[in-house]
A protein has these predicted regions:
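Active-site neighborhood of phospho(di)ester-bond hydrolases with catalytic His/Asp-centered motifs
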Residues: 140-142, 171-181, 201-203, 222, ...
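Extracytoplasmic
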Residues: 117, 125-127, 170, 177, ...
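Active-site metal-binding motif and surrounding structural segment of the metallo-beta-lactamase
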Residues: 154-201, 290-296
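Conserved catalytic scaffold of divalent metal-dependent phosphoesterases
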Residues: 137, 144-148, 223-228, 233-244, ...
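Phosphate- and divalent-cation-binding pockets in alpha/beta enzyme and binding domains
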Residues: 184, 208-212, 281
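Active-site-proximal loop/helix segments of hydrolase catalytic cores
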Residues: 188, 243-306
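Metallo-beta-lactamase
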Residues: 2-150, 154-157, 162-163, 203-274, ...
Length: 306
């Protein structure tokens, strides 16, 4: 009985310690600038008018029902805590890690980058970051230049620097964002453009993050799926994706919209997928806006947990 009593006391103490640690973590991270801002006021009102918004749950949803619920069911930590503590992309000791830099071509951007006439010039900078010149305008897709894709610098670290540093970039006319995950929306990169004339094209809700980081709202255009704006001779259409969003794990998931993008001029057309699982929206995008001369499609991020 005495032994059981000691065990019970240790369990209570351990539970209390874990609770205090959890509260401390919440208090710490609630003040983290990296988290951005959850849409409120007029921003939230615009969200509620979207056909992709679920008013009962106050979140955005995918066209395919139950996709996120299925993902969360597979990724539940407590289903197998011993396995899931190490079998994830944050703390998995078996994750293959390159011991040499991957092959790349580094060099100065051409002086005639903007002289595209009826063509598209582009440079892949790593992961989802693409620099493109379309219709004599420079466009940067999902710019990420930080050393890690997380709110803290010691996890999700990149294996090698981007092919071009942020300081080497030419003047950028437009930055196009697909969603607010850290490997696609980089706070430090966004802040780099605070004093520039760059305009931002983002899915619904993401403008709240940018404003929180010092970007004036008159430089940001928010889109719902299938909305189109013609700017500087380029037709920008925000197109669907099958994914999710959030910068605070499960605390504020799906509070901003995720998307892909279709760009078209009189001479050419480009598709940028962002992150997306395979679903019927790919065919619909092709039927409605294709064919495309050039596509940028993220691949390889599949896992049984998502």
């Amino acid at each position: 009985m005495a032994t059981r009593g000691k065990v019970a006391r240790w369990v209570r103490r351990g539970s209390t310690l874990l609770l205090l640690m959890a509260i401390g973590a919440v208090l710490l991270f609630s003040q983290c600038e990296q988290f951005g801002a959850v849409p409120s006021g007029p921003d939230h009102q615009r969200m509620t008018e979207s056909p992709n918004y679920n008013p009962e749950k106050d979140i955005f949803v995918n066209e395919t029902p139950g996709v996120i619920d299925e993902m969360l069911a597979h990724s539940g930590f407590w289903a197998n805590p011993r396995k899931n503590l190490t079998n994830n992309f944050l703390f998995n000791p078996n994750t293959p890690t390159p011991n040499v830099l991957l092959p790349e071509v580094r060099g100065q951007l051409p002086s005639d980058l903007r002289d595209t006439s009826d063509t598209v010039k582009f440079t892949w900078l790593g992961h989802a970051t693409v620099l493109a010149s379309i219709n004599e305008k420079t466009i940067l897709f999902d710019p990420v230049f930080s050393e890690s894709a997380a709110p803290v610098s010691w996890v999700v670290k990149r294996y090698q620097p981007p092919a071009i540093s942020i300081d080497e970039l030419p003047s950028i006319d437009f930055i196009v964002i697909s969603h607010d995950h850290y490997d696609h929306l980089d706070m430090k990169a966004i802040k780099f453009f605070r004093e520039s004339g760059t305009r931002f094209l983002v899915p619904l809700g993401v403008a709240s993050h940018l404003e929180h980081w010092g970007i004036s709202r008159d430089r940001v255009i928010e889109f719902d799926w299938w909305q189109t704006r013609d700017i500087a001779g380029i037709s920008f259409t925000c197109t669907p994706a099958q994914h999710f969003s959030g910068r605070t794990a499960t605390i504020a998931m799906q509070k901003t919209l995720w998307s892909s993008w279709a760009l078209r001029t009189e001479a050419t057309s480009v598709y940028f997928s962002g992150d997306s699982g395979y679903a019927g929206h790919f065919k619909e995008i092709g039927d409605r806006l294709g064919p495309f001369d050039l596509t940028f499609i993220d691949a390889g991020q599949y896992n049984e947990r998502w």
